[in-house]
Amino acid sequence: MNAQLDGLSVSSSSTGSLGSAAAAAGGGGGAGLRLLSANVRQLHQALTALLSEPEREQFTHCLNAYHARRNVFDLVRTLRVLLDSPVKRRLLPMLRLVIPRSDQLLFDQYTAEGLYLPATTPYRQPAWAAPDGAGPGEVRLVSLRRAKAHEGLGFSIRGGSEHGVGIYVSLVEPGSLAEKEGLRVGDQILRVNDKSLARVTHAEAVKALKGSKKLVLSVYSAGRIPGGYVTNHIYTWVDPQGRSTSPPSSLPHGSTLRQHEDDRRSALHLLQSGDEKKVNLVLGDGRSLGLTIRGGAEYGLGIYITGVDPGSEAESSGLKVGDQILEVNGRSFLSILHDEAVKLLKSSRHLILTVKDVGRLPHARTTVDQTKWIASSRIGESITNSAGFPGDLTEEGTNKPGFYKGPAGSQVTLSSLGNQTRALLDDQARHLLTEQERATMMYYLDQYRGGTISVEALVMALFELLNTHAKFSLLSEVRGIISPQDLDRFDHLVLRREIESMKARQPPGPGVGDTYSMVSYSDTGSSTGSHGTSTTVSSARERLLWLIDLMENTLDLEGTCETTQGSTNALPDVSVDDVRSPSEDLPGIKPPPPPPPLAQGHDRLLGQTRKPVREDSAPLSSAAHSGIVFSAPRNRSPPPPPGIAPTPTPGPSSARDSPSSPIYASISHANPSSRKPLDTHLALVNQHPIGPFPRVQSPPHLKSPPAEAPGAGACLPPPSPSEHADAMGANQHFVLVEVHRPDSEPDVNEVRALPQTRTASTLSQLSDSGQTLSEDSGVDAGETEASTSGRGRQTANTKNKNGKELPQTERTTEGANKPPGLLEPTSTLIRVRKSAATLGIAIEGGANTRQPLPRIVTIQRGGSAHNCGQLKVGHVILEVNGQTLRGKEHREAARVIAEAFKTKERDYIDFLVTEFNVML
């Protein structure tokens, strides 16, 4: 064996070194030439030499799970089981060289010594012995035969492919047929009558179990069941020049904000000698502080300086972009809320700041749901302790509630929590919802409890409100307060919604089947299929080589770091005896709207009460370039439930925005005579909501060439938010086009489609539980005193700053040129002045799609399109500056619009639009 590894020197390769040899990369059953790095070839050779074919398959499953989730802890924990000898553990340093740099620090920590794992105890199986003489972890057969057609089986299941896990037995009723035949809680059901359950959804598993009188189950004694989801926020980090970088060394674990502040400053090594400094600021009359900050405890971050104005006191005192503010006037900024930090910096003319030169900034955030498991030793406790504290039911490392026995999905018999209280629901809602959303949900529940609305109306309203995977799980707690006579209807409606979302997210082709091995417990099973890899055994080695190469060469979210904003969501737990067929349609009942709660904003220009918010918005990769966000359709989602009014949209004058608000603030105590855009503006990240049961992919991004940028011009004030309150598209394939100044080329960043249903909402209502673009378009990239001081809100008539009304004409297109599906031959010419640094629209569609012509789905606040006031969400764009978009694919149409905005030949763009959709 040593002879086989003579050429496998760990120290001979360096991270990122590229090999010159070409090798075949497996993908969709085909092979193509690709340059593989020396690290990839080295690891692949070692895998062939050290592992058997089944072990390599398990290794492939392990990498699939890591590639889908980017969870280093799960990767290392699985490798501890697979690499069970010192010789096999020689693969670890080779694997380290091909994982993304941002994960290597965590990989080193979890593997103890960095390169080699210490000797570990074997994986502990359940203490009870498996029936029929099978040892723990072995596959056995359980035969169940109903004496009557409608006799119950006596057990409940949870899990499914929509949750990224298999099908597990979560409850076995005492004295039931299942108990007599040896079925146990914690068993994973692999097959039912020769039908594999490896990749089936929860509903499909129920159908398979109820479809026959005689059942022969192949079960695996896993000794654990999925307990729920913990939602982790993943951040990308950049340096002051906008280049992607690794996270700060003080944030490796994602639980820092929950530590005591006194402990953090020592345990996280924030106060090493030379790292921090004291800055004494005394603001005289007419002098501005000139700081732009980002972060806050509500985002799991500290307070970071993202902008320093030229000539300000902050610049004179040596503050710079990339500094973290640790303390101000004796008040710790390590776990302070964003608004409190803004208030404190505004409140004094004499500031003593303690700052640390971190040299990194949080750039963009995405949300990842991680499955938490309940060990066999705690399963019985979780079943019997219905009123117990949920935090006591999870495995090690789980600090938040993770398991409840009455979740949404279907009727549950013995495993339901009939005595769930509203306090438990309120506690979960505090973790998952904003105050506004929580108040709205409680309003609907009060209306239902008072008999004002029916259970159907309540469920439909909650579907509209709980529009993300994490939020949707709250239905498990809502079920506890549903009246007994309404439980069947409630379960039926929720199950129907789940099935609809599953169908909407069906992959285009079959994926690689899962196995019952220990290393694939948490495998989502979608990553290989989503990349089109072959599913045949003969291509296993090519798949493994392709996966390793992909992991090293994919432009990943460099510098990601899991933060503390974790929230836990329960998995559906369904008794196979009580599921009814979802065949009825949802009624169109409109409940009364909730009282409009107050909205407040995160971003303020400190010391300037009448100035609009300065948003730290231009992407970091260039000084001040404009951007347009586009989206292309992937899978159409069903229309939103009828009769449910969307959540009230906060206006620009409100004091607090929704959670999707940018987490930045500009700080200035006095109005400076002039303001210039910084050399490094930071991106404003817009969060997009996703429907239930998401699979979050890491969005690739391209490095943007630096571009010299002139100062941004004045922007027209935005109109009323009611001007663009149209609903956005449901399922989108987001494409970001960064429109640079004419001396640079635009970048195009693509993010994989999230095939979930999404209910209609406006941009200001978007939840932060969705996928975040790695770089996005600026919303308000520049700010000048002339464009912001003493200016009122513009009305829907939309006149420019000189009082001249923008031209708007209507004309009729020829019948021969009418796009297919256009209901009326009426079009409108709208002239959009380039009044802001960004155009600020998102489009979907293009040639060869279900939407032949691009349609506007989002209009960002502060952009030129928003300032114009005439472009609306839903407008179909026929021409841009006289150039037709017929026959142009999505990317080409986006390029045409981007070039039209970028050109200096004219200071406006003429859009020929129609009010009607062009859906075919």
Swiss-Prot record:
Residues found modified as Phosphoserine: 698
GO MF terms, alphabetically ordered: identical protein binding; protein domain specific binding
Tissue specificity field: Ubiquitous. Highly expressed in heart, spleen, lung and liver. Highly expressed in brain, in the olfactory bulb, thalamus, layers III-V of the cerebral cortex and the molecular layer of cerebellum. Detected in soma and dendrites of thalamic neurons, and in cerebrum in cell bodies and apical dendrites of pyramidal neurons. Expressed in retina and inner ear.
Occurrences of domain PDZ (ranges): 141-224, 278-360, 829-912
Quaternary state and interactors: Forms homooligomers. Interacts (via C-terminal PDZ domain) with MYO15A; this interaction is necessary for localization of WHRN to stereocilia tips. Interacts (via C-terminal PDZ domain) with MPP1/p55. Interacts with LRRC4C/NGL1. Interacts with MYO7A. Interacts with RPGR. Interacts with EPS8. Interacts with CASK. Interacts with CIB2. Component of USH2 complex, composed of ADGRV1, PDZD7, USH2A and WHRN. Interacts (via PDZ domains) with PDZD7; the interaction is direct. Interacts (via N-terminal PDZ domain) with USH2A (via cytoplasmic region). Interacts with ADGRV1/MASS1 (via cytoplasmic region).
Gene that this sequence comes from: Whrn
Taxonomic source organism: Rattus norvegicus
Compositional bias of kind Low complexity: 520-536
Keyword Cytoplasm part of the UniProt annotation: yes
Basic and acidic residues bias spans: 802-813
A single GO cellular-component term on record: photoreceptor inner segment
Compositionally biased region (Pro residues): 589-598, 636-651
Protein name: Whirlin
Annotated PROSITE patterns: PDZ (PS50106)
Described function: Involved in hearing and vision as member of the USH2 complex. Necessary for elongation and maintenance of inner and outer hair cell stereocilia in the organ of Corti in the inner ear. Involved in the maintenance of the hair bundle ankle region, which connects stereocilia in cochlear hair cells of the inner ear. In retina photoreceptors, required for the maintenance of periciliary membrane complex that seems to play a role in regulating intracellular protein transport.
Region (Disordered): 241-262, 502-536, 561-603, 630-730, 752-828
GO BP annotation list: auditory receptor cell stereocilium organization; cerebellar Purkinje cell layer formation; detection of mechanical stimulus involved in sensory perception of sound; establishment of localization in cell; establishment of protein localization; inner ear receptor cell stereocilium organization; paranodal junction maintenance; positive regulation of gene expression
Keywords: Cell projection, Cytoplasm, Hearing, Phosphoprotein, Repeat, Synapse
Gene3D superfamilies xref list: 1.20.1160.20, 2.30.42.10
PANTHER family: PDZ DOMAIN CONTAINING WHIRLIN AND HARMONIN-RELATED (PTHR23116), WHIRLIN (PTHR23116:SF37)
